Amino acid sequence: MLRPKNNKTKPRIKHRPFLKWAGGKFRLTDDLNRVFPKRKQCLIEPFVGAGAVFLNSHFERYILADINPDLINLFNIVKDNVDAYIEACKPIFFAENANTADYYYAQRETFNQSTDPFVRSVLFLYLNRFGFNGLCRYNSKNEFNVPFGAYKTHYFPEDELRYFAHKAQSAVFLCADFQQTFELADKHSVIYCDPPYAPLPQDTNFTGYAGNAFGLEHQKHLAECAKKAQTDKQLSVVISHHDTKFTREIYKGAKFKRVKVQRSISQSSEKRVKVKELIAIFKG
């Protein structure tokens, strides 16, 4: 007898996030769906980023968190009123000089000076699409400081925004750190973690995407939280990271799956190579 296909394992269509995102997991979503435990109702992501895993998984509910208040503010605005958001973005995206350095840096300055949540959400998308390499980076004054990307063409992600808004009706977006987010999990949940990566030996240190360094001690603490959730609450936790001696050591006790993926962050095209990615599975 034929069994029905599980839609958590094989999403019919892959949906791209409306944001560019350094270290995004769009290429890893099929592998992750294959290791997520079945019959769980809620996916919890303490490091949601652009939301590629959320967009390409099929759970009843989502709890999606990040420590970047601009990102969570943007997601909540898109969720609540995508039509108004799109109409506000278009004049900025389609301005005659939108793809120039002068215009970009003027908008960046406006973003850094503004305290209006809606204005910041609109400019965040513009800066993301026109800035360098999908980076989201702030300086010590909490000012967005990603340089102009100087791309030949640009794209307004209206379809992606509308799909995100549709999918987001089953999601809650929270500005919280990973420890706070772990506390929200119950027996119906699976936790997926995509932390800022510890740099490879040849990399410059681009781990502090939200202006907060996520160092080796944070990496170790996250691993301990995953182990504690597994042993104390019988929760399943999945973590993706570079496949290195360090990550294999801190995730010791998990089941490992190794895959090769294209790097989505670099300072030069020569560094866009396939690297070994480790998926650590703490099965509850």
Each model region followed by its residue ranges:
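Conserved S-adenosyl-L-methionine
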Residues: 35-94
